[in-house]
Amino acid sequence: MSDAAVDTLATGDKAEITEMPSSDSLPEDEVHCDSATISDEPMPADPRGDVLENAALQGAEAAAPGPPGQPPDANAMESSLNEEVIEDTLAECTDSVSLETEPGSEIPLKEQNDLAVDSPASGGAWAGWGSWGKSLLSSASATVGHGLTAVKEKAGATLRIHSANPGPSEGAQTDTEDGAPEITDAATDPSPAESPPISPPSAPRGMLSAITNAVQNTGKSVLTGGLDALEFIGKKTMNVLAESDPGFKRTKTLMERTVSLSQMLREAKEKEKQRLAQQLSVERTAHYGMLFDEYQGLSHLEALEILSNESESKVQSFLASLEEEKLELLKHDLISIKDIFAAKELENEENQGEQGLEEKGEEFASMLTELLFELHVAATPDKLNKAMKKAHDWVEEGHTPVSVDVTKESEEEMKKIEKEEKPEDPQEDKKEEKSMKTVEEVYMLSIESLAEVTARCIEQLHKVAELVLHGQEEEKPAEDQAKVLIKLTTAMCNEVASLSKKFTNSLTTVGSNKKAEVLNPMINSVLLEGCNSTTYVHDAFQLLLPVLQVSHIQTSCLKAQP
Amino acid sequence: MEAIWLYQFRLIVIGDSTVGKSCLIRRFTEGRFAQVSDPTVGVDFFSRLVEIEPGKRIKLQIWDTAGQERFRSITRAYYRNSVGGLLLFDITNRRSFQNVHEWLEETKVHVQPYQIVFVLVGHKCDLDTQRQVTRHEAEKLAAAYGMKYIETSARDAINVEKAFTDLTRDIYELVKRGEITIQEGWEGVKSGFVPNVVHSSEEVVKSERRCLC
């Protein structure tokens, strides 16, 4: 009865949770680029992040002759030349940031500079290039598809103006009225301002900010299909850069030899897709954590930790109080308990005989009851069993499970289980609908079930710890309890593993018509959470060691005393 | 945006066995009353959001402890990380009222150096005919320890909300006044998620102004 209630509660809370990741991830995006955040019409968080990341990537690639993502042949073949080029590039980069010598730089640029000095220079000199490319390309890519021609024209014009006159950047000036935002953007770039300005020509910088302005103000859209516009801007930029810096000319030639900008952008987009997929799974991971917490898994883990720590200090202080001889004896006992805990892995393999998936749920329930009975602790596995049953039930659509067939269970417990099943009925009625579950639903259910079952496993271990410590009339030797606990933990871990396998199977079935890039992250994430789940359970089990040691000390002392 | 809460308060519910701690919490968190309830083993957990002012939510994490004497030594270990507590007695059970003093003494020893804001709860007030503790004497005892007193019934849902929300408000006030602070290594009060969108737009406005002048 408690369980059903907890469930409802948790479900109620879930709505809140789903909201979290988006608001959580916001700050991060903002760090990357204030400009996008500021633009009058904010774009959805994700695409924005993408574009930026994309652009940053692109910027790095476009700027550097031999970035990690690129074929190493360029580096290998012309390493000496490359070194030079890199140096030049670096000079260019630093130059683009430190504007002290810039006579015609307008206020925003100065401001930029001031702020840049304040901002930490993370990532060394290369970061300069990254951010340089970012400020240009992020804004550029953000506008693609929306007023492309305008962008082209404006960028082209600015570039022309600029190459004619290295000092003033009128374009930037005029755009400042509504273009203030991206100044902040540039200002927050983590550019290495403290690196000394090497080459005097600061022209590229002024031009750049002009482009940034021009590009940014023109519109807002995501990077789709506007590659040629970007390419245009990129080429123009390269030319201008090359004109004012002979070193960069070499960079440019090198770049032209290797890949075209559009190709690189496409690659970057692919990378971005992958990153996005990963990002999604990260958000979902957070989701698991929240659910795990909502099912009070964290609280039970924390409480178990409290008990474990307290027991540990009890053991230590008791050992400290003993004389040599007794100490050795007790130490021996405690170590043998510890050894049993360490032997878990072996047991794990022994027990892994695969059974039919359908039987497993019931099998597990009876095994759980049996093991707890063997432990001589009055812990009832109702909650865990119910969670397991629920998990198995939804994943085996159509297959109606027989009521839990627990062999060694007392009649009372049977009654209890029956009682508790009642509130669940309305959910079971919905079974027909469940056959129409979408991949996302299956995915969410999988994560939720893993979170719930894991939380219940940890609750169970916590309860065992509490009962082992206090409340037993007739204690079973700690060594024996340890052996049973291993079996219990192994059973739990196996069950969780088999559940996550079931869930991925179900995902594969339901999502057979989905593309791999949609389905795979979900499957990976379920497998990952399944792994995490078993780790949680296993960690919780390890927390029981001091508890059993204390229990051993208590019983052996009781024996010794009379 | 339900998930946005200002703080999380950890509350502990203590009192003699069978005074109705779990039932009170279940009424509060699940909105229903269980006729039959198993004795709590060690500690159990519940949580609920409480809106103390419009838009200001506090997440309550409630630790439901076992009242049975045999679990006392474990439940003690859980006191330390709570900011607030409900100390229950059964108005139809004089003994449980007499033990209130003992409970307070015990928690005092085990929460140091922290403090718990307690409210004294006279439970099962629906059973007024079987009352063994008068409201007056309960109020007197509560006042002696600087606690508020409230009578509740989980079965009839009397004052259940009020007991929790009043306590939450009191703690919130103390937190606001800085008399209770969030501390490293103490779980009693935790800061929640606060949207920081406003913050970033403020920055924007600032830099814009500077740019234009």
UniProtKB/Swiss-Prot annotation, chain B:
State the residue spans of region: Switch-I: 35-43
Any one cellular-component term (Gene Ontology)? vesicle
Q: What does this protein do?
A: The small GTPases Rab are key regulators of intracellular membrane trafficking, from the formation of transport vesicles to their fusion with membranes. Rabs cycle between an inactive GDP-bound form and an active GTP-bound form that is able to recruit to membranes different sets of downstream effectors directly responsible for vesicle formation, movement, tethering and fusion. RAB39B is involved in autophagy and may function in autophagosome formation.
Q: Which gene encodes it?
A: RAB39B
* Name of this chain's protein: Ras-related protein Rab-39B
Q: Where in the cell is it found?
A: Cell membrane; Cytoplasmic vesicle membrane; Golgi apparatus; Cytoplasmic vesicle, Autophagosome membrane
Q: Which SMART domains match?
A: RAB, RAN, RAS, RHO
How does it sit in the bilayer? Lipid-anchor
Reaction catalyzed: GTP + H2O = GDP + phosphate + H(+)
Natural source organism = Homo sapiens (Human)
